[in-house]
From Swiss-Prot:
Organism: Rhizobium meliloti (strain 1021)
UniProt KW Ribonucleoprotein keyword: yes
Gene3D superfamilies for this protein: Single helix bin
Any one GO biological process: translation
Biased segments, Basic residues type: 1-16
Protein known as: Large ribosomal subunit protein bL32
Residue span of region Disordered: 1-39
Molecular function via GO: structural constituent of ribosome
Entry similarity comment: Belongs to the bacterial ribosomal protein bL32 family.
Keywords associated with the record: Ribonucleoprotein, Ribosomal protein
């Protein structure tokens, strides 16, 4: 069975756990519509991505 040779210091333990925190998602304001959207994602209301029409937006009935 594997056993650690040395005790893990609180500093090393904290550095290992520093990546475990949940981060709030970032949003940017769309240039055309002014809506908030995730970076590198399609704007679902307009269907635009990087200035090109990628999807046809759904019309709410």
């Amino acid at each position: 069975m594997a056993v650690p040779k040395r005790k893990t210091s609180p500093s090393k333990r904290g550095m290992r756990r520093s990546a475990d925190a949940l981060k709030a998602p970032t949003y940017i304001e769309d240039k055309n519509s002014g809506e908030l959207r995730r970076p590198h994602h399609i704007d679902l209301k307009t269907g635009m991505y990087r200035g090109r029409q990628v999807l046809t937006p759904k019309e709410n009935a």
